[in-house]
Design a protein with these regions (language model features):
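RNase H-like, Mg2+-dependent phosphodiesterase core
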Residues: 1-173
Length: 173
């Protein structure tokens, strides 16, 4: 059976990130969260989120009883780069993949729940806010209280905070 690994939240201004693993044939799943603090200050600069993501996938591998003969389709995103490298080095059948369908939808749903648990809003409010520009406007309406939800480690955050327009694709660089 195939196991898929996907993330959600890596490119979002607000919140941490969610990592999901799902065995396609049985729909067994494992979900882990990378807290927003991993994307702030020195933790972001040292890329503390990468080993955290690897720990989540290791825990998920145990929970799902992952075997080395199962193909592991891992999303192409940077946040999963250490996972791809480590699993491949350990002899797992890692396949770089664009994850779509049920696993991607699960990742998105879990990320929305993550933001709601953080206090960003109800699930419905978060769904309406979802998107770079909407999140930025929401944060800037009360930046003193809401900056704690932001990936402040992004180089662009100081400029975004004062209202400078930046291409969302370049904001986390």
């Amino acid at each position: 059976m195939v196991v898929e690994v996907d993330d959600s939240g890596w490119g979002d201004l607000v919140g941490g990130a969610v990592i999901v693993m799902r065995r396609v044939g049985t729909n067994d799943k494992f979900v882990g969260e990378v807290p927003v603090e991993e994307f702030q200050g020195s933790a972001f600069k040292s890329k503390a989120y990468l080993p955290h993501v690897l720990r989540i996938v290791r825990e998920g591998s145990v929970a799902l009883n992952l075997t080395k003969d199962e193909p592991v389709h891992v999303c192409t995103g940077y946040i999963l780069s250490e996972v791809r490298r480590s699993l491949a080095n350990e002899g797992y059948r890692v396949i770089l993949s664009k994850i779509t369908g049920v696993t991607q939808e699960l990742a998105e749903e879990e990320y929305i729940k993550h933001l709601s648990r953080l206090g960003v809003g109800t699930i419905d409010q978060v769904k309406r806010l979802r998107g770079f520009d909407s999140f930025l406007k929401w944060v800037l309406r009360d930046v003193d209280k809401r900056e704690r939800f932001v990936k402040t480690g992004w180089k662009a955050w100081p400029r975004l905070k004062v209202g400078e327009k930046i291409d969302p694709k370049q904001a986390r660089d």
